């Protein structure tokens, strides 16, 4: 007898002897546990009943179209069962309404039903539940499905297991591989997860999909028939499955298919218990197997009750499954890591670097097989993947959804999808330089519209699909049409790395580039026509911020913005020096960054000279190193245009203040750089400029050396004179400027923006009224003069939730969608649902009065209001009415919320 029970601190000595004390205390704990378990069971059963009735009432079926001709569903039942959504009569009605006399059902579960329900077109496969199917059966079912689809273009296959997850998914994935849609398991699994989430494929399932790929490869692999001897199994480190979490008591089972042929399980006392200190588990087997082999290891447990009943329980540690025909002939050791093992569901029970090792040996002679495998003498080269679809567009969309590029676009390497494995898919027999791309440009080129012919596109070999109805292996093996180019192209010199820096002299036809950021901003502010495309005889700048876009997308790789604008040193024209603080000779004195967005004046811009130089060497050592990034927000010369903001620069003849030569004018560096000097004067003027305003008074920065000034100011250079200009001078006559050091011209940071009409007592109200208007359109005065509105029209959904609602509204019943919007954020919250029920009731309902949250504080109030709501929306009162189904859905939501309210103890609101 264990002494721990007698010495337990919760036992009182007044209860008597040790045995009766233990029985009494144990009985109390037993009934307490029984009460808790019974309560949880009833709660779970009640919730499952409600969910089942809800789903049945709403007409939901567990029914998924993986393709238009492959359907997956869960098990159909003849009777109502808890937790099952598919009733056989509903499924038959649905299939007969859409695919009458053109569907066949494949039952993969060991459970059966009356096949007459589906017009006796049911194939019983009886696959095991927690294992992968045998390779023989998997291949045979795929071949049967293909033959059925081949008979009539309207035929469809309906696949189901118990839950419509793992077994159904491996069959559909194998069917994709069988029809040459995919040549690797990865895209097939991704497509299955996209179409039916939560399929739960185990590593053994994926392994068998790989076997199907080997059987259906260009050079198909044929499994051998040599028996395999498993000498021993080694597990390291020792997993933690006992109560102390320091070891386990393992035994091993070996199965061929579903038949157990060997086990090491013995009497509990005779079995060895392994501890963490042992380091590994070693179990000798010496069993010979052939075909589909399953190796499972269990932990044997024994409790006091099981000892009295002479029973033991077990917990599965892991399971692995493989086919002996795919093991290489010289293999002696098979290693499986934790991601390659099945049934490893509790990660904390497995130490790091957990692995299983099988010591094996292949026999030299083949075993005579009773049945010929279905893959023998079966040619799959004529199998067309288009048989899985009803249209070519569906075929293309499925390839994209599975993570593989469509057949008319060069795909990535399937082994390293999405990681730039592009050059491995090129057909090097066709030496066209137009098909040489940078890896970083591949993703951008795929998304652009291409003007190439089909023959040019076929020069990029695709390992997965076929095009234009050719044979399915035309994509795997290049045909004559792929090897012979449509028209020989002259050899061209391509600078892949951009080391030479010179533009290609030959002009190529390139697809129209989408508008860049600078073009969009240029059109927005009225200066879109300033820049034109770079001619073929000139050296253009391949800048992503340039309005004309890159010069070519096929002949030369696209340079990044960093390589064109952020060079460490800049080459300046001959004899020219660069002063970053001096004013340039352009007509607009403050156009520091506008030259990056205007190509019309690029010939005289010292900033663009280094990017046009074919040599990366520096020719002006006296030039300081400047790092300039193109600014897509616009130039600084927006004040020179009478219409407001302008992106491009004007010529020297349009401004009386600019110089006509290209040499930069040097000026003294200003002593004060105060960009906030005019912040206090923004309240009294509008940003919209007037056409009749004199030069420099258009609501912006005045040009340098403006004729409006009486004399040059010693402290008003470059930035400060334009930045400190008083904006309110646009409303008064021009005045001669005073020296910058005078107190009248200094910036005032204490201005309170009190330019409001009315007296001192009325200003608070006026400010409150104007605040809302300013928030509604803060920049309306800027854009109103240019023909734009400050209010952005909402033409589409702006959030993910709105986009999801928009998609649901296309397919879902409007009444159901309204119910979902009602319960959003209020799931099973009885108070929230009752207080908002008036928003979801049907038209014409006048009995229900809106209830506030203040009337739902106590449980009694909630109960009273809930009963009133039930009387209003009860389905029995809506029998025969057009809103009967709608009332039933409202009633179900209220019923679920009330059940949750009762389960939580009917707590008051506060």
From Swiss-Prot:
Main localization (coarse): cytoplasm
Low complexity bias: start-end ranges: 547-569, 651-666
Source superkingdom: Eukaryota
Modified residues (Phosphoserine): 109, 450, 453, 560, 567
C2 tensin-type domain ranges (all copies): 225-363
E.C. no: 3.1.3.-
PTM (free text): The N-terminus is blocked.
Active site (UniProt): 161
Tissue: Brain.
Region of interest: 3 X 4 AA approximate tandem repeats: 33-44
Sequence repeats: 33-36, 37-40, 41-44
Biased composition (Polar residues): 596-626, 732-758
Keyword annotations of the record: Chaperone, Cytoplasmic vesicle, Hydrolase, Phosphoprotein, Protein phosphatase, Repeat, SH3-binding
Stretches the record annotates as Disordered: 448-772
Motif (SH3-binding): 406-414
One annotated GO biological process: regulation of clathrin coat assembly
Keyword flag Hydrolase: yes
GO cellular component: clathrin-coated vesicle; intracellular membrane-bounded organelle; postsynaptic density; presynapse; vesicle
MF terms in GO: clathrin binding; clathrin heavy chain binding; heat shock protein binding; molecular adaptor activity; protein domain specific binding; protein tyrosine phosphatase activity; SH3 domain binding
Subunit architecture: Forms a complex composed of HSPA8, CLTC and DNAJC6. Interacts with HSPA8/HSC70 in an ATP-dependent manner; this interaction stimulates the HSPA8's ATPase activity. Interacts with CLTC; this interaction produces a local change in heavy-chain contacts, creating a detectable global distortion of the clathrin coat. Interacts with AP2A2. Interacts with DNM1(GTP-bound form); this interaction allows clathrin-coated vesicle (CCV) formation at the plasma membrane.
UniProt free text on domains: The J domain mediates interaction with HSPA8/HSC70 and is required for basket dissociation.
Role, per record: May act as a protein phosphatase and/or a lipid phosphatase. Co-chaperone that recruits HSPA8/HSC70 to clathrin-coated vesicles (CCVs) and promotes the ATP-dependent dissociation of clathrin from CCVs and participates in clathrin-mediated endocytosis of synaptic vesicles and their recycling and also in intracellular trafficking. Firstly, binds tightly to the clathrin cages, at a ratio of one DNAJC6 per clathrin triskelion.
Name of this chain's protein: Auxilin
Organism from which the protein derives: Bos taurus (Bovine)
């Amino acid at each position: 007898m264990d002494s721990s029970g007698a010495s337990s601190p919760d036992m009182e000595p007044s209860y008597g002897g040790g045995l009766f004390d233990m029985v009494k205390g144990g009985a109390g704990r037993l009934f307490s546990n029984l009460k808790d378990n019974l309560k949880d069971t009833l709660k779970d059963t009640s919730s499952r009943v409600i969910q089942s009735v809800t789903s049945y009432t709403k007409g939901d079926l567990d029914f998924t179209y993986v393709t238009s001709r492959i359907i997956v569903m869960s098990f159909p039942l003849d009777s109502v069962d808890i937790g099952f959504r598919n009733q056989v009569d509903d499924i038959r009605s649905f299939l007969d309404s859409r695919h009458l006399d053109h569907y066949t059902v494949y039952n993969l579960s060991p459970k059966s039903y009356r096949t007459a329900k589906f017009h006796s077109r049911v194939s019983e496969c009886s696959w095991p539940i927690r294992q992968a199917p045998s390779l023989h059966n998997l291949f045979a079912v795929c071949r049967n499905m293909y033959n059925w689809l081949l008979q009539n273009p309207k035929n469809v296959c309906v696949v189901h297991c118990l839950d419509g997850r793992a077994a159904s998914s491996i069959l559909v994935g194998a069917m994709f591989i069988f029809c040459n849609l995919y040549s690797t398991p990865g895209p097939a699994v991704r497509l299955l997860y996209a179409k039916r989430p939560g399929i739960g494929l185990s590593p053994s399932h994926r392994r068998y999909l790989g076997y199907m790929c080997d059987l259906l490869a260009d050079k198909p692999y044929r499994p051998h028939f040599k028996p395999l001897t498993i000498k021993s199994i080694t597990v390291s480190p020792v997993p933690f499955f006992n109560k102390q979490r320091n070891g386990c008591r393992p035994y091993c089972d070996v199965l061929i298919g579903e038949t157990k042929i060997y086990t090491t399980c013995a009497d509990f006392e005779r079995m060895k218990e392994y501890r963490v200190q042992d380091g590994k588990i070693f179990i000798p087997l010496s069993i010979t197997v052939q075909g589909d082999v399953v190796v499972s290891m269990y932990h044997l447990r024994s409790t006091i009750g099981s000892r009295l009943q002479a029973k033991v329980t077990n917990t599965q540690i892991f399971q692995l499954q493989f086919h002996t025909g795919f093991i290489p002939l010289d293999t002696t050791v098979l290693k499986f890591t934790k991601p390659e093992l099945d049934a490893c569901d509790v990660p904390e029970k497995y130490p790091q670097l957990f692995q299983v090792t099988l010591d094996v040996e292949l026999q030299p002679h083949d075993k005579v097989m009773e049945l010929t495998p279905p893959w023998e003498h079966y040619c799959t080269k004529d199998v067309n993947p288009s048989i899985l679809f009803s249209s070519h567009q569906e075929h293309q969309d499925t390839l994209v959804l599975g993570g593989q590029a469509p057949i008319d676009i060069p795909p990535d390497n399937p082994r390293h999808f999405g990681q730039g494995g592009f050059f491995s898919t090129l057909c090097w027999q066709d030496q066209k330089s137009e098909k040489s791309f940078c890896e970083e440009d591949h993703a951008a080129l795929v998304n652009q519209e291409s003007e190439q012919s089909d023959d040019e596109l076929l020069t990029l070999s695709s390992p997965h699909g076929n095009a234009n109805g050719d044979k399915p292996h035309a994509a795997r093996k290049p045909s004559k049409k792929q090897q012979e180019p449509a028209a020989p192209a002259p050899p061209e010199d391509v600078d892949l790395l951009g080391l030479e820096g010179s533009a290609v002299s030959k002009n190529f036809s390139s697809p129209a580039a989408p508008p860049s950021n600078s073009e969009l901003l240029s059109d927005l502010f009225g200066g879109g026509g300033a820049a034109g495309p770079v001619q073929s005889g000139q050296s253009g700048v391949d800048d992503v911020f340039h309005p004309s876009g890159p010069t070519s997308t096929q002949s030369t790789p696209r340079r990044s913005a960093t390589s064109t604008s952020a060079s460490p040193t800049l080459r300046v024209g001959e004899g020219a020096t660069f002063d970053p603080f001096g004013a340039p000779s352009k007509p607009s004195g403050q156009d520091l960054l506008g030259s990056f967005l205007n190509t019309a004046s690029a010939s005289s811009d010292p900033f663009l000279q280094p990017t046009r130089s074919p040599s990366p060497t520096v020719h002006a050592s006296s030039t300081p190193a400047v790092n300039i990034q193109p600014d897509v927000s616009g130039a600084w010369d927006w004040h020179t245009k009478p219409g407001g903001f302008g992106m491009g620069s004007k010529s020297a003849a349009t401004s009386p203040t600019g110089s006509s030569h290209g040499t930069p004018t040097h000026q003294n560096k200003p002593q004060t750089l105060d960009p906030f000097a005019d912040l206090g004067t923004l309240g009294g003027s509008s940003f919209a400029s007037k056409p009749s305003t004199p030069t420099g008074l258009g609501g912006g920065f005045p040009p340098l050396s403006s004729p409006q000034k009486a004399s040059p100011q010693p402290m008003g250079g470059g930035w400060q004179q334009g930045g400190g200009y008083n904006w309110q001078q646009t409303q008064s006559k021009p005045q001669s400027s005073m020296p910058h050091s005078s107190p009248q011209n200094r910036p005032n940071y204490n201005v309170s923006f009190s330019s409001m009409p009315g007296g001192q007592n009325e200003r608070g109200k006026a400010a409150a009224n104007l605040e809302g208007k300013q928030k509604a359109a803060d920049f309306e005065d800027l854009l109103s003069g240019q023909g734009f509105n400050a209010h952005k029209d909402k033409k589409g959904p702006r959030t993910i939730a709105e986009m999801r609602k928009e998609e649901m509204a296309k397919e879902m019943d409007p009444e159901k969608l309204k119910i979902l919007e009602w319960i959003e954020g209020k799931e099973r919250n009885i108070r929230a649902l009752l207080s908002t029920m008036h928003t979801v009731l049907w038209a014409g309902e006048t009995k229900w009065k809106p209830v506030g949250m203040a009337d739902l504080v106590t449980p009694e109030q909630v109960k009273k209001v809930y009963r009133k709501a039930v009387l209003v929306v009860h389905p029995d009162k809506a029998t025969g009415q057009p809103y009967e189904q709608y009332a039933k859905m409202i009633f179900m939501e209220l019923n679920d919320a009330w059940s949750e309210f009762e389960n939580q103890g009917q707590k008051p609101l506060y």
